[in-house]
């Protein structure tokens, strides 16, 4: 049977230990801080990146160069292995499109998948992909199963600082100033892989209550398999959220990590990314 190799980027919020233990090849995004370039999760950690945001430094993220994908695909596929390359949503980054272009320029057998998500929304798809590869499922069938899994995943983002949204052009300076004065915390979700702001909360507690309501509506009669929480240096907020969700949904499985710089660069210090995987 043909060997299958998994490739992804640095935005899944899965631990380095998990990625290494399952032989997942990571092609990282790049970060620019005050004009200096860093390789995500290689030259700088998520925690260190958030420190720069807290200091209100100019931060940007950029997708990997196409040459990095070409080199990886050629090396990994030279023995005839199939490559399954899964990446953060094409609605948030050009990474998927670059990976796809690279796949068309090499002789290797590469299938590129748009996860339509990020953070643990991508991470849970990778975990499922790992299990499917172990079971010997064909690549074409894997694509179908991941499409189905995506229907059971919902991602929310609670914005920490409006400054990052202003810098990114998502809201005007005037709206941002008013929002900061009123301490508004916008909440967004992914709609077909694109971030849409759907609610404005005034406090942490009100944001948690809104998320509880939305999650209850999303899961319906289903149980929750896992909740992933990626935070930008606000573990107290995460603890509050867990307490409410434990009472409401009897959740046993949480995955918690500091969020990927691709999220924190746009949402600021104090943000969380919440991903629900229902059974």
From Swiss-Prot:
A molecular function (GO) term: lipid binding
Keywords: Lipid-binding
Positions annotated to bind hexadecanoate: 61, 93
SUPFAM superfamilies: DAK1/DegV-like (SSF82549)
InterPro entries to which the protein is assigned, alphabetical: DegV, DegV_C, DegV_domain_contain
Pfam families reported for this sequence: DegV
Membrane-crossing segments per the record: none
Residue ranges constituting the DegV domain according to the UniProt record: 4-278
Primary role: May bind long-chain fatty acids, such as palmitate, and may play a role in lipid transport or fatty acid metabolism.
Protein name in the entry: DegV domain-containing protein MW1315
């Amino acid at each position: 049977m043909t060997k299958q190799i998994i490739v992804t980027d640095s935005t899944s919020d899965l631990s380095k230990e998990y990625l290494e233990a399952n032989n997942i090849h990571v092609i990282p995004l790049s970060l620019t801080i005050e004009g200096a370039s860093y390789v995500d999760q290689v030259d700088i950690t998520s925690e260190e990146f958030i420190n720069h945001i807290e200091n209100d430094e100019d931060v940007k993220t950029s997708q990997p160069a196409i040459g990095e994908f070409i080199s990886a695909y050629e090396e990994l596929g030279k023995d005839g292995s199939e490559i399954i390359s899964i990446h953060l949503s094409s609605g948030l980054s050009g990474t998927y499109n670059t990976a796809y272009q690279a796949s068309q320029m090499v002789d290797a057998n590469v299938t590129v998948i748009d996860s339509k998500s990020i953070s643990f929304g991508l991470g849970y798809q990778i975990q499922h992909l790992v299990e499917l590869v172990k079971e010997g499922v064909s690549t074409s069938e894997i694509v179908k199963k991941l499409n189905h899994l995506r229907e059971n995943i919902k991602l929310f983002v609670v914005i920490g600082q409006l400054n990052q949204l202003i810098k990114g052009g998502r809201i005007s300076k005037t709206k941002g100033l008013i929002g900061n004065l009123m301490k508004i915390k916008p909440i967004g979700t992914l709609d077909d892989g694109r971030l849409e702001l759907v609610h404005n909360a005034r406090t942490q507690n009100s944001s948690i209550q809104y998320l509880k309501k939305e999650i209850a509506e999303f899961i319906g009669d289903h149980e929750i398999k896992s909740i992933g929480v990626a935070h930008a240096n606000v573990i107290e907020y995460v603890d509050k959220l867990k307490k409410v969700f434990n009472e409401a949904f009897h959740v046993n499985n949480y995955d918690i990590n500091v969020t990927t710089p691709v999220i924190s660069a746009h949402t600021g210090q104090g943000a969380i990314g919440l991903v629900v995987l229902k059974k």
